[in-house]
Amino acid sequence: QYSYEEGADMTIDEVLRRVDFSGVRLVEITGGEPLLQGEETIALINKLLEKGYEVLVETNGSMHIQEIDERVTVILDMKTPDSGMSHKMDFSNLESIKNSDEVKFVLCSRNDYEWSKEIISRYRLEERCKVLFSPAFGLLHPRDLASWILEDRLCVRLNIQLQKYIFHPGERMV
């Protein structure tokens, strides 16, 4: 399923007007999977950059990121084995990651943690970008993940999904 809520079709100009009206200079494009919109997403990114916005694109890693402008910060959400979605990852995206990008692993278990360490090592991610580890809410306690990171002296950021703690997990507030 692409979206859990009804949306509204908007032109790029309509999106730009809303962004301009907000007064915010940082725009994150996320989804679903924003790259499923193809050329429309790329066109929106380019228009935002032309207007001087700082742009972030959060992608689930199933689509190629090579067409995204170099000025954009890509947040690549790596699917771990226990998510049941790791087979959908396009691992060639890891070759295109640049210093300003982020690779985020949402971990469900110690197995996911070990797998993620292997991916970080294989693609030299600690040297090439920011790496974030997030414990899956209700499946892995943040304290356990923090302990493993410290024991292994990993150069990663512990990233807590704050919306899961602020709002009820079933709410769609953010």
Task: Mark where each language-model region is.
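Auxiliary Fe-S-binding modules of radical SAM enzymes
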Residues: 17, 21-22, 109-174
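Generic, ordered loop/turn and secondary-structure boundary motif
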Residues: 3-5, 98, 163-168
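Short coil/turn linker and secondary-structure boundary residues
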Residues: 7-10, 89, 111, 140
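Flexible, active-site-adjacent loop/turn segments at secondary-structure boundaries
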Residues: 2, 92-95, 160
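Conserved Radical SAM active-site core
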Residues: 1-72
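Active-site beta-loop-alpha junctions enriched in small/polar residues
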Residues: 32-34, 60-62, 79-81, 106-108, ...
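Radical SAM/AdoMet-radical enzyme domain recognition
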Residues: 42-121, 126-129
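Short, acidic/polar
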Residues: 12-16, 86-92, 143-144
